Amino acid sequence: MKIGAMNDPRRDPVAEIEWFGQHGFDFVDLTLDPPAMDPSNVDVKSVRAALARYSLGVVAHAAWYIPISSPFPSLRQAALQEFQRALKVAAHVGAQGMTVHYFRIPPLFPPERYVEWHVEGLRPLCSQAGDLGLTILLENAPGLPGQIDHIAHILEAIPSLGFHLDSGHTHVEGGVGLFDVYVERFGRRLMHVHLSENDGSYDQHLPLNSMPVGQIDWPARIRRLKASGYDGTISLEVFSPDRAYLLQSRDLLRQWWAAA
């Protein structure tokens, strides 16, 4: 298992990478968002050099708000083009995978449209990623009841698509127990994990184990994840301005994983 963290897209990416390298992380979850990480303006050479300097791995994360499943065909095409730009950067910095978010559309359409429009964009993107030696990963979104079935159909339609499980999003979507349901259903396709804490009301990106007793049993959750056979990359999405909380979460995760 490898532990990483996500850069703040408002900050200089090289400085972010250096901080993660200096504090003992295994990889960087490189988010490709404006303002500082717009794919059209990334200094790929500097990013690669910083990663190499600290022997850090990298996974890429496209902007979560790109509307891959918009009801408007022109927006879906524009979304695909944005993902393709991000994919090129991901390949150039040495990423093995790039995350794309499941995207909300207005509840005016039948469920098959959710699946159809995602597949329309993800299928060619996965093909292009394969040519570059990368895998596209689909991440569950926060607070979208029913998406688990849509994601199942999308994964079935695109065998080369991987799954990215965000624990905070599952808590907002359906409570504490939904994380285990996702692991059970998609464990064979699971290629990346995000961990963070919240109180179930929204995606707060709090430090692990920061909620009162009776919320998430983190040692048990990590045991179930490890028992599923997963042994890959885990990003800590702890977005406190005081990064001591990120380091504390990292140390807790190492402790729980070793004990699992």
Positions of PLM-derived features:
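N-terminal pre-domain/capping segments
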Residues: 1-87, 91, 162, 251-260
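Active-site acidic/histidine proton-transfer and metal-coordination neighborhood
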Residues: 11-14, 50-53, 69-162, 172, ...
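A short, flexible beta-alpha/helix-coil linker loop
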Residues: 33-35, 65-67, 104-108, 170, ...
